[in-house]
Amino acid sequence: ATAKAAPTEVSSILESKIRGVSDEANLDETGRVLSVGDGIARVFGLNNCQAEELVEFASGVKGMALNLEPGQVGIVLFGSDREVKEGEIVKRTGKIVDVPIGPGMLGRVVDALGNPIDGKGPIEATGYAIAQLKAPGILPRRSVFEPMQTGLKAVDALVPIGRGQRELIIGDRQTGKTAVALDTILNQKRWNDGNDESKKLYCVYVAVGQKRSTVAQLVQTLEQNDAMKYSIVVAATASEAAPLQYLAPFTACAIAEWFRDNGKHALIVYDDLSKQAVAYRQLSLLLRRPPGREAYPGDVFYLHSRLLERAAKMSDANGGGSLTALPVIETQGGDVSAYIPTNVISITDGQIFLEAELFYKGIRPAINVGLSVSRVGSAAQVKAMKQVAGSLKLFLAQYREVAAFAQFGSDLDASTKQTLSRGERLTQLLKQKQYSPQASEEQVPVIYAGVNGFLDNIPIERIPEFEEQFIAYLKANEGDILEAIRTKGELSSELLDKLKSATETFVATF
């Protein structure tokens, strides 16, 4: 039989046993993993943890505390959950998820936490900002009045966008949604190469849940067109963890807000928010939050509204900067009345609706002119464009009305035939090649010629040729008209007469 411990030894044995036990009182700052799986870790401890705080696991993986429940904390992982073991120690970092900001970000590609992924060395940030900041209040804002030119005739003429506006780009897959946003970024080059800071527009592009090849191609396009120097790309691709896809738009928004809050102008493209909603749904269901419509959580509207509300035009007292947002939403089979599309349509100040059918007909950009609107942009439209584009909307609407009849009979009256032929020509006029955005001074004369009937006798297939030669003719002979549109942004009655006679002269020789 084993000898009993003498009473004097008992205390020393107990002491040696107790020394082996970790200090349980320290559960305020650290915790232990209870279970891990599907990118979610449930942790016991971390009593002082804040919501959305960054935490670090012993294995080096980082995570964000989303659910603070009695007895445990639900943490989403920013990396692979294979590294994290049950019983592993987790510690607080004491900071909410923040990202590097400043002009040093320009020309860089970063991940959802703001770490560079382009192999160009560390980022020279001027500071850090919390990713999920609140939007500016009502008083620091002012209404939108400056144009944000996309370089696409169909957009600048019919659904003009102003600086500080939020314009949704919505359509099925492969209808050219990213192309519209990308052309807008490329179009800013003509101002960003100059020295006028008030005209410059810094661009932030967020890729959420896209293929890596697509993002690489996009960065390459920006570099080839020398547009990367004023752009920032934030990438959370399809292979990355859902929490990163959920966070990326907020990260990018914080980066773009630096420009807005320093009296500069920025543009942010969220491509696309459907993927962010899907990632957020995944997180919410794994964290066992109750599902709502289409199994999205109840606060998926708030997810998008708090993000898009951060795009704003600031008042002069607050620096007069602006942040314009172009969120992208992908619909399934043209269904605009699904949950996420209706949510985002109601949050934004208008939408550009792209249709697969138009795209296959060769009308590109495939903008459905009837369903696309801009709720605040007309106040910001270039005046010269407003002068010529007003009747364009009307003609296209009349054309859509009678286009249905056109299939039936040849015995249409003259005015209907006239409406049809002009409508076809205007539709042709609004087509545009990708990566070739046009300045407003090139758009206005062409649209002027279209709406005033100068194209009515030109064969449809020759319209692109007409457009090219007409602009060249004006540049050579009537430079002052183009100069006036570029500098003043409006056409006086003398210049309108001049444009009219120039157009007549050119059409006669064409």
UniProtKB/Swiss-Prot annotation:
One of its GO terms (molecular function) is proton-transporting ATP synthase activity, rotational mechanism. It comes from the Eukaryota. It is a peripheral membrane protein. Pfam families: ATP-synt_ab, ATP-synt_ab_C, ATP-synt_ab_N. Keywords: ATP synthesis, ATP-binding, CF(1), Hydrogen ion transport, Ion transport, Membrane, Mitochondrion, Mitochondrion inner membrane, Nucleotide-binding, Transit peptide, Transport. ATP binds at G171, D172, R173, Q174, T175, G176, K177, T178. It is found in: Mitochondrion inner membrane. The keyword Ion transport applies. The keyword rRNA processing does not apply. Mitochondrial membrane ATP synthase (F(1)F(0) ATP synthase or Complex V) produces ATP from ADP in the presence of a proton gradient across the membrane which is generated by electron transport complexes of the respiratory chain. F-type ATP synthases consist of two structural domains, F(1) - containing the extramembraneous catalytic core, and F(0) - containing the membrane proton channel, linked together by a central stalk and a peripheral stalk. PANTHER family: ATP SYNTHASE SUBUNIT ALPHA, MITOCHONDRIAL. F-type ATP synthases have 2 components, the catalytic core F(1) and the membrane-embedded component F(0), linked together by a central stalk and a peripheral stalk. The central stalk, also called rotor shaft, is often seen as part of F(1). The peripheral stalk is seen as part of F(0). F(0) contains the membrane channel next to the rotor. F-type ATP synthases form dimers but each monomer functions independently in ATP generation. This is ATP synthase subunit alpha, mitochondrial.
